[in-house]
Regions:
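Short beta-strand immediately N-terminal to the catalytic nucleophile in serine-hydrolase-like folds
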Residues: 44-46, 92
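Helical cap/lid subdomain of alpha/beta-hydrolase-fold lipid enzymes
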Residues: 59-213
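Long, hydrophobic/aromatic-enriched structural stretches that serve as scaffold segments
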Residues: 39, 53-60
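Active-site catalytic motif of lipid deacylating hydrolases and related acyltransferases
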Residues: 1-42
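Gly/Ala-rich beta-loop-alpha elbow adjacent to hydrolase catalytic centers
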Residues: 46-50, 54
């Protein structure tokens, strides 16, 4: 929707299944490239999970998504098929087969509170987690502490409708089971490394200054 423009729509069936907001009011975009279609195809480049996202976007564009067994979703993206809109997908440092780090990150969500504390001091909305569909939006006059407490205890973290699941080993395996390679798209995958080999050993350790995420 950020590319083409329009109101984000998570689909009636999907929204009902996970009890999320189907059309978050603050996710309506003008579009970076409104003319995007089969006559004006694009190249997608995704870093980290962005590689998975690009592949999923192709799936949503080229498959009919149903509201129920008989009725298509009432959405241009979900209820119709758009082929040949993507020329290539390039992923950079994307864990297409999942990463064990996903479980570590999920369990250390409370660590975010430290950063949000800073955000509270400087009075910024930078740490909006862009999860309005789950209700992860700071309410009027809600303190940062209350906001984080509400977020940490949300049921979203235990569902498959969250990034930590998609990036996990099991989640990536499930995604790969239905995201098929398209004969109309060129695929490129660029790998990276931030480790160095220990002298006199076969072990590799993180390079100095490497971030955990």
């Amino acid at each position: 929707y950020q590319l083409k423009g329009g109101q984000v729509d998570y689909g009636k069936n999907h929204s009902k299944k996970y009890s999320i907001i189907q059309k978050p009011k603050n996710k309506n975009y003008k579009g970076l490239y409104p003319q995007w279609d089969a006559s004006n195809p694009i190249h997608l480049i995704g870093h980290s999970m962005g590689g998975q996202t690009a592949r999923m976007l192709d799936y949503l564009l080229t498959q009919n998504i149903y509201e129920n067994e008989d009725l298509l979703e009432d959405s241009k993206l979900l209820g119709g098929v758009t082929n040949h809109a993507i020329l290539s997908i390039t992923s950079i440092s994307t864990p297409h087969n999942g990463t064990t780090l996903a479980e570590i990150v999920r369990k250390t969500i409370p660590f975010i509170q430290y950063f949000v504390g800073i955000a509270g001091v400087v009075g910024t909305d930078f740490y909006s987690f862009d999860l309005e569909q789950w209700g992860f939006r700071r309410m009027l006059k809600e303190s940062w502490a209350d906001y984080i407490s509400r977020m940490r205890n949300h049921k979203a973290w235990s569902t498959k409708n969250i990034s930590s699941w998609d990036l996990s080993l099991s989640g990536a395996e499930e995604i790969n089971s239905f995201l098929q390679i398209s004969p109309n798209i060129y695929y490129f995958s660029i790998i990276t490394s931030t480790t160095i080999k220990k002298e006199g050993s076969s072990q590799h350790v993180p390079s100095k200054g490497t971030s955990i995420i």
